[in-house]
């Protein structure tokens, strides 16, 4: 659906380009000529399904668990380290600016318990090392589906806060195991 787009300030131009501009024309032509459309996120699947339901197939992102072994996390840690990765040029698009504001308030309210690891536009290997040393990953705010970082974090045993909408689980046929703490673009959530 369109509802998540309305949360992203300044996204109107990008939406317009993909809905009616040159990018839309090229994308539609490729979809028409393709034998199939592999959609790795709920958002991609739903975007193609209305016009190309015979071609659109949901194929979740694969994770090699041997490359990301589960780590030991204490059941009741004295402190909880939250990890947030920020790409300066995509901060508003992913909602990390809003998530960071809430996280900083939480750290001010509970300074002895809440710790923040913040990666700002760092190389991916450094990003992963910082993430692996944390307990909770704050992923994308405006997504219905976790991306690779969210999936890798869960494989390592971290709690993930981000996109985990019911529609995504329904598409996968999953009715019971819903491990992501889903948040809405509302600071009270």
What are these regions (language model features)?
Residues 28-33, 37-39, 44-63:
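Helix-loop-beta element that forms the nucleotide-linked donor phosphate-binding surface
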Residues 80-82, 97-126:
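A conserved nucleotide-sugar
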Residues 63, 67-94, 100:
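Conserved donor-binding/catalytic core segment of Leloir-type glycosyltransferases
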């Amino acid at each position: 659906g369109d509802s998540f787009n309305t949360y992203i300030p300044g996204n109107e131009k990008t939406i317009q380009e993909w809905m009616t501009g040159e990018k839309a024309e090229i994308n539609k032509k490729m979809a028409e000529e393709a034998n199939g459309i592999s959609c790795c996120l709920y958002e991609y699947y739903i975007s193609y399904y209305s016009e190309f339901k015979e071609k659109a197939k949901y194929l979740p992102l694969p994770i090699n668990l041997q490359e990301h072994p589960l780590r030991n996390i204490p059941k009741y840690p004295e402190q909880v380290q939250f990890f947030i990765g920020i790409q300066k040029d995509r901060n508003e698009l992913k909602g990390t600016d809003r998530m960071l504001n809430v996280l900083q308030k939480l750290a001010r309210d509970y300074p002895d318990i809440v710790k923040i690891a913040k990666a700002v536009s760092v190389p991916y290997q450094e990003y992963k090392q910082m993430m692996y040393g944390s307990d909770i990953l704050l992923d994308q705010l405006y997504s219905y589906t976790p991306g690779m970082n969210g999936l890798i974090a869960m494989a390592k045993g971290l709690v993930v806060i981000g996109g985990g909408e019911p529609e995504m689980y329904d598409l996968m046929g999953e009715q019971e195991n819903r491990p992501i703490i889903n948040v809405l673009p509302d600071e009270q959530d």
